[in-house]
């Protein structure tokens, strides 16, 4: 991951913690993929994809969460839940930013 990506993750984490979410894991990897941030929001476990683009020339940051990426996130989340024996409500959010703009938190970006 490059420095811009790390900075975007740091800003995303700060935003979510400011909104009351608690960090569970960061950059969690499994054979099928990676989850940038795993947070706790009350009873819900929140899987967060962080996306940053330097500019909007090729579309916004949210546009880069393709159907293939969504499938990888779902698979990684299933592996995480299974390997940690977790049975709680969960959702998939994204924190997106373009250029120097403030990050935006998008809830429920993937519906199962």
Swiss-Prot record:
Gene3D superfamilies: 3.40.1350.10. It comes from Chromobacterium violaceum (strain ATCC 12472 / DSM 30191 / JCM 1249 / CCUG 213 / NBRC 12614 / NCIMB 9131 / NCTC 9757 / MK). Disulfide bonds: none annotated. This is UPF0102 protein CV_0654. The lineage of its organism: Bacteria, Pseudomonadati, Pseudomonadota, Betaproteobacteria, Neisseriales. It comes from the Bacteria. GO terms for molecular function: nucleic acid binding. Belongs to the UPF0102 family.
């Amino acid at each position: 991951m490059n420095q811009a990506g790390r900075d975007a993750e740091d800003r995303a984490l700060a935003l979510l913690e400011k909104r009351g979410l608690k960090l569970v894991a960061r950059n969690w990897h499994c054979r099928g993929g990676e989850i940038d941030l795993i947070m706790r929001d009350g009873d819900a476990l929140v899987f967060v994809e962080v996306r940053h683009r330097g500019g909007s020339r090729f579309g916004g940051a949210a546009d880069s969460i393709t159907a293939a990426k969504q499938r990888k996130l779902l698979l990684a989340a299933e592996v995480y839940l299974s390997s940690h024996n977790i049975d709680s409500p969960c959702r998939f959010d994204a924190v997106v930013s373009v250029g120097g703009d403030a990050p935006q938190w998008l809830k429920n970006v993937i519906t199962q």
